[in-house]
């Protein structure tokens, strides 16, 4: 395994550990989730550049679109929670409440 792949896997692992550690705050969770998505995007781009199969080249773009949608939904949740409660704690997210 090359050092580039090792660094990307290390970035993904650190983001995953940050997600598990700071799961009580929504902002920290969103930042760690974004770090995980960006490391997956870079890994998919490297794999697509190394393989010359034409259908693999669209995979990083699809992953980037999903990351942008995830960011938009996360920021909308953050604004909604901070306007309602004034805090960004995840335990304020009660999906069963109408």
UniProtKB/Swiss-Prot annotation:
Membrane topology of the entry: Multi-pass membrane protein
Keyword hit for Metal-binding: no
Electron transport in keyword set: yes
UniProt-annotated location(s): Mitochondrion inner membrane
GO molecular function terms listed in the Swiss-Prot or TrEMBL record: NADH dehydrogenase (ubiquinone) activity
Swiss-Prot/TrEMBL catalytic activity: a ubiquinone + NADH + 5 H(+)(in) = a ubiquinol + NAD(+) + 4 H(+)(out)
Enzyme Commission number(s) from the entry: 7.1.1.2
One of the record's GO cellular component terms: mitochondrial inner membrane
UniProt cross-references to InterPro entries, sorted A to Z: NADH_UbQ_OxRdtase_chain4L/K (IPR001133), NUOK/Mnh_C1-like (IPR039428)
Membrane-traversing stretches: 1-21, 27-47, 61-81
An annotated GO BP: ATP synthesis coupled electron transport
Protein keywords: Electron transport, Membrane, Mitochondrion, Mitochondrion inner membrane, NAD, Respiratory chain, Translocase, Transmembrane, Transmembrane helix, Transport, Ubiquinone
Role, per record: Core subunit of the mitochondrial membrane respiratory chain NADH dehydrogenase (Complex I) which catalyzes electron transfer from NADH through the respiratory chain, using ubiquinone as an electron acceptor. Part of the enzyme membrane arm which is embedded in the lipid bilayer and involved in proton translocation.
Family of the protein in this entry: Belongs to the complex I subunit 4L family.
Quaternary structure and partners: Core subunit of respiratory chain NADH dehydrogenase (Complex I) which is composed of 45 different subunits.
Protein's name in the database: NADH-ubiquinone oxidoreductase chain 4L
Source organism of this protein record: Macaca fascicularis
């Amino acid at each position: 395994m090359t050092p580039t792949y090792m660094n990307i896997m290390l970035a993904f692992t650190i983001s995953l550990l940050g997600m598990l550690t700071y799961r009580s705050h929504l902002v920290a969770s969103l930042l760690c989730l974004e770090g995980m998505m960006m490391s997956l995007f870079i890994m998919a781009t490297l794999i697509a550049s190394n393989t010359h199969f034409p259908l693999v080249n669209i995979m990083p773009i699809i992953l980037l679109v999903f990351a942008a949608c995830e960011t938009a939904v996360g920021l909308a949740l953050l604004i909604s929670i901070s306007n309602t409660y004034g805090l960004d704690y995840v335990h304020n997210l009660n999906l069963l409440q109408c």
